[in-house]
């Protein structure tokens, strides 16, 4: 028979392993938000912390490799031969150019010849409900965050 013991209210120092993981996620997401704020101070606020936390967890689960060459995701799924597509990882808060919706539809006419064929967005991580190549993008004009597919990322040249 196993006995369960509970810690008291406010006694959060009972499990050092889980506290270290929470600290790592918090610091990583904090860094992601601050980095994005430096480049988009008028759009990125601390309200985007949940997006950064999910992105930090996704990176730790898919990119941290132990001495046996396995990521946490490989250990849980017991899938040793899988490989992470590094092309799906981008800088949190980087500029994203989204293809005009009129060009995405089949048989639709495009925008007039001298109008832009894309719009600017801000990358906030992978969409949890779609394929790995679908990103969550914030529209700076409206503030709407939506999943987007036809994208070009500008990872290195902003700032």
Model regions: which residues?
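HHCC-type zinc-binding knuckle of retroelement integrases
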Residues: 1-143, 149, 155-156
